[in-house]
Amino acid sequence: CLGARTGQEVKAFRNLDIESIGIDIVPNEPLVIFGDIHEIPFNNNKFDIVFTNIVDHSLYPNKLVEESERVCKKDGIIIFHITVGKATDKFGVTEILKSQSVENLFKNSKILKSQHMEPWHGLNWEIILKKISN
């Protein structure tokens, strides 16, 4: 989980028996270790699932996507929950007007779903992708 803050998402994955770890620039161990979403501190092709809901907090969304694809295994799943068409929260630096502006950043993944989701803490769009190549 990228930008995992206190680790709620990590805990949710673990509750589903999915081995997981979070990274954030403010660690909260044991669920969240220190790491920058623009330079993910893991080897290539490490994870079956990559999840984030902080694209709007990314200074360089293209680098976040590139790093997400790098650490995701071939045939792995990448899930981005984003806020589309609304102002971001107080930590946001990237406003997303259309989901395509994020979708188009992916070079090695195929979109499985890109759809509106029930708004939750401002997040209103879900993009689910499958990594198809390295």
What are the functions of these language-model segments?
Residues 48-61:
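A short SAM/SAH-binding and catalytic strip from SAM-dependent methyltransferases
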Residues 59, 73, 107:
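Short conserved AdoMet
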Residues 75-85:
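Conserved beta-strand signature within the Rossmann-like core of class I S-adenosyl-L-methionine
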Residues 62-77:
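A short glycine-rich, Lys/Arg-flanked "PGG" loop and its adjoining helix->strand segment in the class I
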